[in-house]
């Protein structure tokens, strides 16, 4: 089958925002206006097309990033709707990794909110061009210009309106297009009848002022335009649009639009802006990767003529077709039934069927081309972040960084029958979500699951019960502490056992030093002259890794430690891998006596929004929870407090804040970094874990 849409006419976009900014409703309207659905589903009624999981419909939030494809103005637009809740940041991150552009949705009453900052930062890291849609212009307190200002103040973004609203709140009835300098007036509830007319007299001065500001801001990014502007020459609409497109794609400029998705106003103009200003796969730099055979960097330009290269960005279990692997094609063509090489795992995979997804319904297709986003059935070994390439032209693309989980729960099956089902269910859920970990405590046999927050684990346990019919008891949430060394030391590990027959002998000297935060464990072999034979070196490293998994103070995994094996001895007959593994673990125990071991706890960046009258309460909450305030900001008659607070102190805070503010206060938190716990807290943790 020939390519239906050229690369120039393809857009891969994400829709991202703070929870409740109206992101899913915006996507729904896009699907409605592009003819994908015939009846609009409302999120608050639990009928949205994109939020297809039962829990999403009950909670009214988006959990997984559903992918869909739509058509507008002769273009194909592949859309990924991403969650706005911080516990699901990996969904946002892996979507951004495979997108070319994004629409950031703001609530026009609140402007930039905490999670907007998080997703904006992630999009900046990945260099994703963005347009901004100030939604909910019909809401009481909606303020378009405040929203634009918040983009400057909180994100330092070079964002400028290319539209202005006509009226706001109940009176929001149309939009001024600052490029055409025309007014678009909505005359029916479905937003399908739009009258283009002259700008109403009372808005002419404001429109002229903001058109001038727009031209000036865009001219700043384009030398030719700047010359024309300074010489007082007229700048045509085509020139202005071309310059906005160029600056947006270069991530130097962010066009801001307005509307109300719920009231069906502004969505078609936003779709026009997606086509006009966001990049096609040809407008962005060619993807880079490493050739696994030569270790050389290679590029894969977006072209059907190039060898096939794609990135798997999401795994999903579908009740009808089984395991689905979502992937983005960067170059080349792929047919169903063909073989690809998973270069990340070094395994050959067969593509059974290829599906084009629409939320959770699907259409089978024979071929995918460069720039497409699709799902494949039949891949057994591929997980999130793996590269899939032509077997003859191997390349490993940059993978997706996965944040470490910070919270854990114990789960136990209610019956023997549930036990087997639970193992399978947890394995499938972990395949889908790289931030969800499943471990078995070796000593107690308990199953421990870890994730990014209470809601994250709550949703996964709920899915285990609903989708896999597993009944399980769930323990209270626990913090994922870590351990480390704060001082350098040298330690000997000596293990000798003689008891008739073959003995055991291992002897090592290891220097331990603290490593940089986030660098993890690093092992260095500095043995000279074979005092420890080469074949036993891996056993020393393995012994350390295994021992560090259960810390030296309270049994938590050790991080950020360097170990240098520099001396030792061996016995010709009695030395073995096991003996050197044990010797290494004894060296770690010995080092703990002088290396100032410390317990680390996850620190959360907490953003609390509360009425001004409750500011004293909020500051008291932060202090009482061992937190420290990082900044404050007044927004109207509310105060926004940003603080770093240990996760251990945040359990149950929602209830405390609710009662202190009569339900008017809200908070969001996201993991920020690990920090040493105070000595008194460390002693309590050690005591608790030793069962005293």
Curated annotation (Swiss-Prot):
- Organism of origin is Streptococcus agalactiae serotype V (strain ATCC BAA-611 / 2603 V/R)
Stored InterPro entries: EFG_II, EFG_III, EFG_III/V, EFG_IV, EFG_V, EFG_V-like, EFTu-like_2, G_TR_CS
Q: Which GO terms describe its molecular function?
A: GTP binding; GTPase activity; translation elongation factor activity
Organism lineage string: Bacteria, Bacillati, Bacillota, Bacilli, Lactobacillales
Q: What does this protein do?
A: Catalyzes the GTP-dependent ribosomal translocation step during translation elongation. During this step, the ribosome changes from the pre-translocational (PRE) to the post-translocational (POST) state as the newly formed A-site-bound peptidyl-tRNA and P-site-bound deacylated tRNA move to the P and E sites, respectively. Catalyzes the coordinated movement of the two tRNA molecules, the mRNA and conformational changes in the ribosome.
* Keyword hit for Cytoplasm: yes
Gene3D superfamilies assigned to the protein according to its UniProt record, in alphabetical order: 3.30.230.10, 3.30.70.240, Elongation Factor G (Translational Gtpase), domain 3, P-loop containing nucleotide triphosphate hydrolases, Translation factors
Q: Which family does it belong to?
A: Belongs to the TRAFAC class translation factor GTPase superfamily. Classic translation factor GTPase family. EF-G/EF-2 subfamily.
Q: What is this protein called?
A: Elongation factor G
